[in-house]
């Protein structure tokens, strides 16, 4: 099936193992023209030596003439070519076991040699690439030990071999030493903490590189296999809302209990949501929306999942148990499996891409801008953030989970705005009862009349008491001025006209606050009598609004 070893490849084969028996398979013809890099020779030699290569079979001499392989050198030459080794050994004493333990790339080369096919992978030198006869299959004890070494990677299929260990009993030892495995585990942990490659990789993943390592042919395949897993672990680390599994209905006026969550959801959708066709309001007990209506029915259906804990949108990938209440959240999660990153940074010259828009916004605000437009509006807090999610997290953790709700729906009156009509009379009456008449005198002639609470009366000496203010005829509550009135004030219409005339030509010294108060009481009482329907069938003409008080007096 295979041709004998060619003269070009024979020195390398003699270096790696004893001369093969007659009929043994050798290297493929396609490898005769390959030139392997020198940096992988120590790794390959160390991997052979660590698995029981007989030291006596090594040839310290050079390669044969015409060989195109970069064959291993002697002790002196090997020390010069060992560019990637960090071993402090001298040229005269080279220990391959030390090379295995101290070489920064020995573990990576071993992984590549296991997962490489017969045609080679990514330009790395593997055992099965050089000669299929040298390919070997690890016994179960070795596979288990190697799985412990590289437990962070998914299980890899074993490489195909053309020759079992039983055909070469003196070539490989059955199992490696346990001390070597433990030492390699320690090296792996130290390298993960100190190696720039390992430290740089999570940073690049968090920034969202547009090209995943799995699709790039120049990167290590081990990193490509870890890329998708890192995305999943990154998503798993995100804080999620508490898992709710509700089976009782707390709708207003309903206290039914069910066995499963599905029955509760079916009950709410059919009896509570679809039963109300005109308004879409959540009547769940202690709901933070405080019965504010939704614009559409489907919004109420999605909102109710916050109370019931329903998550109908489940991940379809095998082995993933993620589920979401909103469809857009599921779509974002699926991108962690597929590697899709449709949101590209809008900054010129930046090729970063992200799986969701919020991560892109965070990147643009943090990397390309120093602006922090999202400000905490809690009184006394001056925190500013680049993205809304960080602001929400700050409000929830520092000011409490209900801080944004209480601030958004608080019922305090904004300064500068008038009080509602229903609350104005009581507040004004209380102020009158507590402060007394002296409080009215402090206002320098300012009266609180209906619909004119915030407008002071003009000075009696400089202007007539009649003004172009809106007439109180359209108001049904005529006692909102804050002054207690009786049914009969004891005055007549002639007194009203006389008082009005006096008010026009009198001075502040003659009338004072009591005179102005009496004038307003008489005017309001007379206007109330005018609004009553006449028993004699007299129909008064309708007065358009707004109308001047002078016109009211003249027309009557």
UniProtKB/Swiss-Prot annotation:
A zinc finger (C2H2-type) spans 247-272, 280-307, 313-337, 343-368, 374-399. Pfam families: zf-C2H2, zf-C2H2_15. The keyword Cytoplasm applies. It comes from Gallus gallus. Belongs to the GLI C2H2-type zinc-finger protein family. One of its GO terms (cellular component) is cytoplasm. Transmembrane segments: none annotated. It comes from the Eukaryota. The keyword Transcription regulation applies. InterPro entries: GLI-like, Znf-C2H2_ZIC1-5/GLI1-3-like, Znf_C2H2_sf, Znf_C2H2_type. This is Zinc finger protein GLI1. PANTHER family: TRANSCRIPTIONAL ACTIVATOR CUBITUS INTERRUPTUS, ZINC FINGER PROTEIN GLI1. It is found in: Cytoplasm; Nucleus. Acts as a transcriptional activator. Binds to the DNA consensus sequence 5'-GACCACCCA-3'. May regulate the transcription of specific genes during normal development. May play a role in craniofacial development and digital development, as well as development of the central nervous system and gastrointestinal tract. Mediates SHH signaling. Plays a role in cell proliferation and differentiation via its role in SHH signaling.
